């Protein structure tokens, strides 16, 4: 019940508010729909503008004639039934509400200016698949969107939005009209390559950066895995090279295993080569005796140290000076002075001792003589066993060759 009352009230408000569109210099007729009783002849026309209400004119009926007073006769006039006639020779009368009041009854007329339309604006966005039609100037307009000669959407507002799907290459026409004019605008839409049509290039740049960073991260991850794998293989190879050679007992066991590797497989033994075998199916078999010599070569003999240099000879001492002659006494004649003795010769320098001979280097051990491998025993094959060349097995597995 409450819903019905609200609906009737809204319907009454809508029916009592009438919008009239008119152009400049076009006569506007506001009809009086009330039946006026001669006993109650008072009737009012009021105006509303910018939420301000003012009394426009007062009318009274005497007999069948309506007489009004208080209005501008150059813009307004009344008929015999008190209907209002407007002469819109300027824009002052537009965007106003004229209220007709009789007793407890009211009706509102809103007069709006009707403008001719301009060419609409049509835009599209390939990223969102959106077409937009926009009104630029006209009033009381209807907008229609036509795609491939078919109306797909319409509105009586100023903006029309439409999302399309499916085809990315078509023709769109935006048509706008009202009661006095009509115009349209056509656009050829081509979104077959959205990457080149993006209007929001920041989103495209964002995705490109994501792809580049992801590729770099994947490349770095693969490089790290490759480097670790190479280091692991290299370390394993170095450990195999630096491992000690097998002893003689192991050599005999290995040679014995090589010569007796032909056997019938047990039911539980798979007819497949050992893992990491260096030989594949149907390949020739080579026998090689492991070398017993160490991998490292014999050290070279140490060189002889150089002989110590001889010390320099000591210098000779200087000769002693001759003593002065003694003075003569007066009666005796003076004797000639004795000659000075010759200086003693310097002793010859001691000869340098001969250098010590180098100790003889230790003789290298004689290399082990090579002995030919033992011949394989001839084992006769049964008639129903096919030759070895047709069997998909590896007879001898050499896990390591030095």
Swiss-Prot record:
| Sugar attachment sites | 25, 37, 52, 55, 72, 77, 81, 89, 95, 108, 125, 137, 148, 153, 169, 177, 184, 190
TM segment ranges: 205-225
Please tell me whether the keyword Disulfide bond is annotated for this protein: yes
Cite the InterPro entries for this sequence: Ig-like_dom_sf (IPR036179), Ig-like_fold (IPR013783)
sequence repeat start and end residues: 302-307, 308-313, 314-319, 320-325, 326-331, 332-337, 338-343, 344-349, 350-355, 356-361, 362-367
- Give ranges for the Cytoplasmic compartment: 226-402
Q: How does it sit in the membrane?
A: Single-pass type I membrane protein
Q: Which cysteines are joined by disulfide bonds?
A: 126-191, 133-174
Q: Its principal location?
A: host cell
Q: What happens when the gene is disrupted?
A: Highly attenuates the virulence in vivo.
Bias kind Pro residues: ranges: 319-386
May I ask which residue range the UniProt record assigns to the signal sequence?
1-16
A Gene Ontology BP annotation from the UniProt entry: symbiont-mediated suppression of host adaptive immune response
Task: Give an example GO cellular component term for this record.
Answer: virion membrane
Where does the record say this protein resides?
Answer: Host cell membrane; Virion membrane; Host Golgi apparatus
Where, in residue ranges, is this chain on the Extracellular side?
17-204
Describe the PTM. Answer: Cleaved into two fragments of 63 kDa and 26 kDa containing respectively the glycosylated N-terminus and the nonglycosylated C-terminus. A full-length 89-kDa glycosylated form also exists.
Q: What turns on this gene?
A: Expressed in the late phase of the viral replicative cycle.
Region span, Disordered: 238-276, 319-388
List keywords of the entry alphabetically: Disulfide bond, Glycoprotein, Host cell membrane, Host Golgi apparatus, Host membrane, Host-virus interaction, Inhibition of host adaptive immune response by virus, Late protein, Membrane, Receptor, Repeat, Signal, Transmembrane, Transmembrane helix, Viral envelope protein, Viral immunoevasion, Viral penetration into host cytoplasm, Virion, Virus entry into host cell
Q: Where is the composition biased (Basic and acidic residues)?
A: 256-267
Q: What is known of its domains?
A: The C-terminus contains repetitive amino-acids that may function as a cell-penetrating peptide.
Function recorded in the entry: May play an immunosuppressive role by inhibiting lymphocyte proliferation and subsequently facilitating viral replication and generalization of infection. Responsible for viral hemadsorption, which may help viral spread. Increases virus replication in the tick vector at the step of virus uptake or replication in the tick gut. May play a role in the host Golgi reorganization to yield viral factories. May play a role in host cell penetration.
Instruction: Say which family it is in.
Output: Belongs to the asfivirus CD2 homolog protein family.
Q: How does it assemble?
A: Both glycosylated and nonglycosylated forms interact (via C-terminus) with the host AP-1 complex.
Q: What is this protein called?
A: CD2 homolog
Species of the source: African swine fever virus (strain Badajoz 1971 Vero-adapted)
